[in-house]
Amino acid sequence: MSRFIRYLPFFIGLGLLPVLHACVDQYDPGLTANTNLLVVEGIVTDQSSVQTISLSRSRSSRDSLTKIPIQRAAVTVLVNGSTPVRLSEVEPGIYQFPAGFKGQVGQSYQLRFRTEQGVAYESSVETMVPVPPVLRAYDTFNEQGIRTTADSRPVPTNDVYVDFQDPGAQTNFYLWRWRLYESQRWCATCEQGRYTLTDLGPVGSGPINVLGCVRDTTLGIFNLFDYPCRGLCWDIFYSTDVNVFADLNADGRLQVGRKVASIPIYQRDQALLVIEQLSLSPNAYRYYKLFADQTQNTGTLADTPPAPTVGNVRNLADPNENVVGYFSAASVAVLPYKLTRQNVTTGSYQGLFYAINRRLPNVESPRNGGSSAGVGVPSAICIPSRTRTDLLPPGW
C-alpha cells in the first residue's frame, strides 16, 4: 500500500520529501522505545543529478521520536579502494558530492566518516551492478484504491506497472522508487497576514519585490488567506514504500506487470510520474527486504518493528553499536511516465489543495487603494524547493 496518502497532509507543511535528497533514499526506521541510534541514508547512483548522503541520530521514547542531524562530520567515499572523494555539508546533516560526480557500473564504493567528537565509522564495500531498462509503463484505474487512516474511505488510484527483461545466467536484485509531479494552483497561505509583492517595473514584465506573508494584526490570529500561483507550478511527491524484487525464480524471463506505484487521484489534471528502477547488491537487497518485512508488512511505517534494522555501517571502535540505514551503490534506469487520467471514469475530486489542507481555499477580498499591502489581490510566487518546482517537469 502506498504511504503517499497517509503523509500527504504533512508533505508541504513540513517541507519534506518528504524524505529523499536527489539520489538518496531516506527511510526513517522504526525504532524501539528509549533508543539513540545513528542513521545513515544514501545511495550512490550513475545519474548526473546532485548526490548526497544524510547522517542523523534518531532518539525515541515511548511517546516521541526526534531526528537530530549530525553536523560538521568529515565524510569521504572511497572509490575502488583507492580514490577518496570528499563530501561537503550543504545543510545540517546533509553531505553533498562534488559537482559532476556520478557513479559508474563496475566500480566499488565505501563510505567513511568521522564525527565532530572523533568517532570513526565505515560501511562495507558496495559494487555498482548494471540494471536493465524499463521497456514500458502503463496504468489502470482502481476505483477502490487505497484507504485513508482517518475515515477508511477508499481513494481511487492510478496503479502503475512496468515491464522489463531480466538478464539471464545471473541473480539480479531490484528496487523501485518514484517521484510524482502534480500541478498546483495555490502557491501561498498566510496566517494572520497578507501576501505582498510589488512590481519594480515595467508592470507585468519587469522584476518584482516579493515580501511574502506580511503580518496584519487586524486579522484574527487563526485567519488564513490563500493565494493562487502567479505562473505554472508543480508539487513534487516521493515514494516512501520499499519495493524490492529478486529474480531467484524468474532468471532471464521477461517480467510483465510489476506494480511500482499506486498514485491517489485527488484531481483529474495530468501528472508526471518519474519511475526509477535500481539494481542492488545482494546485501543491500537483504537489508531493504528485511526493512519492508518489519514495517510495511506489519502495519504502517509508524509501527515499531521487533528490533531496529541494522545496516552495513559500523563504528570502528565499538562494533556493538547499532547503526541503522544502508549505504549502497545502484545503477538506475529512469522512465518518465505521463498519467493522462483519461481512464478515470468515476469519482468526484476536490483538487490537490483540498487533499493537502483538508479545506477549500480562502481567498482574500480585493484590496482598496488605502491598503498598505497594495491594490487588488496578488498572486503568489511558486518558490522552487525539493517539493515544488516552477520548471516544466522532465518528460512532460
Predicted regions: what is each one?
Residues 19-22:
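C-terminal motif of bacterial Sec signal peptides marking the signal peptidase cleavage site
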Residues 24-74, 78-396:
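A sequence/structural signal for flexible, mid-protein segments enriched
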Residues 2-12:
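Bacterial N-terminal signal peptides that target proteins for export
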